[in-house]
Amino acid sequence: MTAKTSQTAQYFDLLSSLVLQGTGAEASLNPESVERDLQGVSELSEQGLTDFLDLANANHVLVRALEVLQRSAAAIPGHDRVVSWCETALARERARISLAVQCLAPVYKALEAAGAEVAVIKSLDHWPDLGSDLDLYTSADENTVRRVMIQQFQAKQEPRSWGDRLANKWNFKLPSMPELIEVHVRYLGQTGEQKALARRVLDRSVSRTVGGHGFRVPAPEERVIISTLQRIYRHLYFRLCDMADFAALLRDGAINFAELKRAAEVGGIWPGVATFLLLIAAYVKDYGCALEIPAEVLSAVPSRDIRVYLGGQFLRVPKGPAAGLYASQLLSAGRHADLRAMFRLPLLPPLAISALVAYRLTGNDKGVW
């Protein structure tokens, strides 16, 4: 293990401890653990604090981690440096988030006014944190989306990768905000194979008010579905925000597991959904968060000993079990005569290989993946 890798592991452990406290069944902070985490951060150099902040930002947990840290530092004498550092970083991040939500709201309303059904997916799951881009799902056609974004907001359409075209995704850059707005049009999944599941996102969406603005967002079950597609069937890694977001849903009993199973089976991804939940429960357990997952869910997990591992800045999913889950999804599409999925899912392995080759050659897979 290199010094850099060891340092990242140390920072990730600190972040996990700060963020995951209070997300277990007891939903309470451990004073001894918080004080230990505070001491660990207090001992960091200026460069160490910068690296710690970068890791928190990459995992979309900056606000949650620093809020806990700031409260602890303010309550214990001798940590003025950490208090000041937290205040500065939080003020900057909250300003970014506020601007992003203010810019997203009129886009959302304009799409609705154009006759589109629309929901904000993934982005608001991390609240009070926010991701590095903003995701929308809509049933509208791409011409409507492009017309609204370009004509009403002077947005610049970003170049589309092969993966974007398969998934029917479009990215737009607004002059007023640094984050991209990514619009998923009519389908979900890396190859755009999920049509029925995508329809459920709108049919079962719920209202949510954020920053004084109202949005439709996926119901908890569809949140799990969307993140499973992203983490288990596409990226093969989790951000720490995923662990915190879904640990909180499990803690609060917000997930209807019968409804979740019904939805996942429609898309042929029930084993992947069950694996997704197991990985979350197993990871947060190491930080004192005891979460219960029904036995009927765990029975659908093909590899009960699967665990995430730290690789780079994220928590990686082992490729072997993930390949098995992909094969299971493809077989399910065949059994159910899902022609769209049957024709599109086989395109995923060559797409992934092309992305890997592009990354190895150029250090960037954006034109492919």
In which residue ranges do the predicted regions lie?
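Conserved NTP-donor binding/palm subdomain of two-metal-ion nucleotidyltransferases/polymerases, i.e.
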Residues: 2-132, 138-369
